A protein has these predicted regions:
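Short, acidic, small-residue-rich periplasmic hinge/interaction motif at the N-terminus
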Residues: 25, 37-41, 71-75, 85-136
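Short acidic/polar hinge/loop motifs at secondary-structure boundaries
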Residues: 57-59, 187-215
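Extracytoplasmic beta-strand/coil segments of soluble accessory domains associated
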Residues: 144-187
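Short strand-turn segments of transmembrane beta-barrel domains in outer membranes
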Residues: 217-220, 229-264, 275
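Transmembrane beta-barrel wall of Gram-negative outer-membrane proteins
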Residues: 250-279, 288-328, 352-369
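Membrane-embedded beta-barrel scaffold of Gram-negative outer-membrane proteins
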Residues: 367, 373-391, 567, 573-577, ...
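Gram-negative outer-membrane beta-barrel transporters
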Residues: 449-450, 515, 622-624, 642-737, ...
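Signature of Gram-negative outer-membrane beta-barrel scaffolds
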Residues: 453-569
Length: 805
């Protein structure tokens, strides 16, 4: 199959145009410059940007010579002229510049994690960028597919679509991204990152322009979590000129996707509107029929005004997301999975997530002087979700039934029964309302003193968030294969169903980037003052009186970090860093709870090598946990939301990434490779009620952290035709802490997934592509939680038409 695909791709290469290919690098360090703009003078429609390796390519049909302008923030603009015989594999060097950033540039900079010029090669620590060019290659909807190329980042698949991802970094917990800082445009985007960090909302990946991931000491100024790292979703930017672009996709399993963006800018304002409509029928088949897909709608508006002089700018961002997904926590028994992995029991027919998310941010920039600017952002996020899903059958939890615990055999039979007695099924309305809001301000100053250059940042954030938990359960019976309600529940009634979790957090950070000759140092610290509270009204459903149970906790923590890089020679850099890791606990679900925060000491050592068209980065990391923190969410255990201290843990590993661009016989072969090795073990013994840990012994391996992950991508390009093949391997992964041999009963399957995309550029404005996800139709167990065994997505064909006018 693979040989046939390559032969077809090579045959198609006969249709091509002239190609102008190059790389943009820093003239002083030899390192690639990311997202540099390449524009053909005299033609606004012919242009591109460099990817994370500094590569770019342009189709320049019928041109004997070309004059281009290359721009990048923090660099002097360069204009170059090239003759046709020199179109192939050129290197363009840009000089670093102390050019003053405009307020509009500052707006863009403060929404990013990658600093001036989006150039992570300047950062003395681990920072990965998935650039605009790379995002457009596959144009994925599933965030798991997007970030799988980044070493040191772990994903636990759940629904096959990435609707509610589980992401961790360098051995941190994966559960609902609760141990990382999930951000959009530099603003915390998890529904309640302090009071209830498990994120049941994730921004839609396909509407994003690029993605940034920070790990190690390079992410110290982002809180509250610093043990893992930060992921920043970078939303669509306001275009410089009048523009209308979009993509329409159709595919198997009822997939229909439409994305449109339009906008423009003038000297004093900019405006952009984007919509993303995503609908899928689902790939799982419910016994007796039913919908297993989803319908998701996204709308984004950005408006900017700025002064004539380079003094001030103000940007408004408003977004709205709606989701209705027929997703469940109910998996399969091993026997049923082996017989039909994409089956769903009829008892999950009513399962449905109904969610709405609204965000508003207002960001203002003032240039106080040529080397001092102040940026302030007010943000407000509202999120409501009600995940109505099967909780128990005949009094047994769905987890115990699918684990086939003693006494649950009759309940298992009811999962696919045609008729039952009344009240056989407990379907719970997991109804929550979240709010997070705050004001964050950053002062940035550039100056020189005693032979050293400084970029000093001082920031503070006043933040509050809450999660209002007001749940209930309805009881059903099965009547001729259809669920019929028999006993409606009372809203808020039941243990721990009538609660409010709140958090107030004030944080301050200071960070100085110091450059002395070939040495770049970053020294910083972050201070967090956090107040957490949990109120439980119990049976007082109207909350007319003081809560019957109130639990509070206060935390004050200082999180320092230090990183340094040294430019050994042109294109070769080494770096190291150390920082304190921290993750706050909640107030506890019971009055007697006394949960300690997560604390660790984290080290990294790495090197970067860049020469010609290939780049390599190698990093080793060592995270020494004084105390690990776990939480029993419904996604990982029984859903008590109790937190557990896991004591000492040692997580160490290696991250390797490599990119190259090969030109041969008029064909281009872009290639990238990443590898992650992780060793994660408990360093003390203890007993816990947290299912994934259980009774732990020294040197037990942590669950859901694969030892080895590999990602590779190979492209073939010539003129109007591009095709890319990507491969992802994930080792068998332990599902419960332990040291015993991995089997189907205590681990996921090893996963080897291949995706293919082929694109044809019809003309300057139109392109067509054809994608195959999971080319070999590999069928594996990706998880045994929340309840039962769960499959990956089967092979799927998708076609798309993209336009840009």
């Amino acid at each position: 199959m693979l040989k046939q695909i390559i032969l077809v791709s090579l045959t198609l290469q006969t249709l091509y145009a002239n190609k102008f290919l190059g790389k943009v690098i820093d003239s002083k360090t030899g390192m690639p410059i990311i997202e540099a703009n390449i524009q053909v003078n005299g033609s606004e429609q012919i242009g591109t940007i460099t990817n994370k390796s500094g590569f770019f390519s342009l189709s320049v049909t019928n041109l004997d010579n070309i004059n281009i302008k290359v721009t990048a923030i923090g660099y002097t603009t360069a204009e170059k002229n090239f003759e046709k015989q020199n179109f192939d594999m050129v290197t363009i060097k840009l000089n670093q510049s102390a050019v003053e950033l405009s307020p509009i540039d500052v707006l863009a900079e403060r929404s990013r994690l990658s600093g001036t010029g989006h150039n992570y090669y300047r950062v003395p620590g681990s920072l990965s960028l998935i650039s605009k060019a790379e995002v457009l290659e596959f144009n994925d909807t599933d965030i798991n597919r997007v970030i799988s190329q980044v070493p040191g980042v772990y994903m636990q698949e759940e629904d096959g679509y990435g609707l509610r991802p589980n992401i961790g970094m360098r051995g941190s917990g994966l559960e609902r991204c609760a141990k990382i800082n999930m951000m959009e445009d530099g603003v915390l985007i998890a529904p309640a990152p302090y009071s209830s960090p498990a994120a049941y909302y994730s921004p839609t990946a396909r509407r994003m322009e690029s993605f940034e991931i920070r790990k190690g000491s390079s992410q110290i100024k982002y809180g509250p979590h610093s043990t893992g790292g930060a992921i920043n979703y970078v939303s669509a930017s306001i275009p410089q000129h009048l523009d209308f672009q979009g993509t329409i996709s159709i595919g198997e399993y009822g997939t229909r996707i439409a994305k449109f963006k339009t906008g423009m800018s003038s000297s004093n304002y900019g405006l952009m509107f984007q919509t993303h409509l995503d609908n899928a029928g689902g790939f799982k088949k419910i016994d007796g029929g039913g919908d297993s897909g989803y319908d998701k709608k996204d709308f984004l508006l950005k408006a900017r005004i700025n002064t004539d002089s380079d003094f001030a700018a103000l940007e408004l961002k408003v977004s709205h997301t709606e989701e209705l997904s027929h997703e469940t926590y109910l998996g399969l028994t091993m026997a049923d999975f082996e017989e039909s992995p994409y089956r769903r029991y009829s008892a999950s027919k009513k399962d449905q997530m109904d969610a709405d998310h609204d965000q508003i941010t207002v960001t203002g920039v003032v240039k106080v002087s040529s080397n001092l600017d102040i940026t302030s952002t007010y943000y407000n996020n509202d999120f409501h979700r009600n995940w109505y899903k099967l909780n128990k059958v005949n009094g047994h939890s769905i987890g115990s039934i699918l684990d086939q615990d003693e006494g649950t055999a009759d309940s298992y039979e009811l999962l696919s029964a045609e008729n039952t007695e009344n009240d056989a099924y407990d379907i719970k309305a997991n109804n929550r309302i979240y709010n997070s809001k705050g004001l964050q301000t950053v002062l940035n100053s550039d100056f020189s003193i005693i032979g050293s250059k400084h970029n000093l940042m001082f920031g503070f954030r006043q933040h509050s968030d809450e999660m209002d938990r007001f749940q209930w359960s309805d009881l059903y019976k099965m009547n001729n294969g259809e669920l019929v309600i028999t006993t409606p529940g009372t809203k808020g009634e039941g243990g721990k169903n009538n609660r409010l979790y709140t958090a107030q957090a004030n944080s301050v950070f200071i960070e100085d980037e110091i450059k002395i000759n070939q040495v770049l140092m970053t020294v910083g610290t972050r201070y967090e003052s956090i107040s957490l509270e949990r109120k439980d009204w119990g049976d007082d459903l109207n909350r007319d009186s003081t809560a019957s149970s109130i639990k509070s906790a206060d935390l004050n923590v200082l999180v320092p970090g230090f990183g340094v890089s040294y430019q050994l020679m042109d294109g070769i850099q080494i770096f190291t860093g150390v920082h304190n890791g921290f993750s706050p606990p909640g107030p506890g679900i019971d009055d007697e709870d006394d949960i300690l925060p997560e604390e660790s000491l984290n080290f990294e050592l790495g090197s970067r090598f860049n020469s010609g068209f290939h780049s390599t980065e190698l990093v080793v990391f060592y995270n020494d946990y004084k105390n690990l923190l776990g939480e029993d969410t419904e996604a990982t255990g029984s859903g008590t939301y109790a937190q557990f201290n896991g004591g000492k843990v040692l997580i160490q590993g290696l991250e390797l990434s490599y990119t190259n661009l090969i030109s041969f016989s008029g064909l281009l072969f872009p290639f990238s490779f990443s590898y992650t090795f992780t060793d994660a073990k408990f360093k003390n013994s203890f007993d816990s009620d947290f299912g994934p840990w259980g009774n732990v012994s020294i040197d037990d391996e942590l669950p859901y952290i694969p030892k080895t992950m590999i990602h590779a991508r190979l492209g073939i390009e010539k003129g109007k035709i591009k095709s890319y093949l990507r491969f992802k391997h994930v080792d068998k992964t332990r599902t419960v802490a332990g040291q015993n041999t991995l089997t189907k009963l205590n681990s996921t399957d090893a996963s080897n997934i291949i995706d293919l995309v082929a694109q044809y550029q019809l003309n300057t404005n139109l392109s067509f592509n054809f994608k195959v996800y999971n080319l070999t139709d590999s069928r594996v167990i990706v998880s045994s939680r929340p309840a039962g065994y769960r499959p990956n997505m089967p092979r799927q064909f998708v076609t798309s038409l993209t336009f840009d006018f």
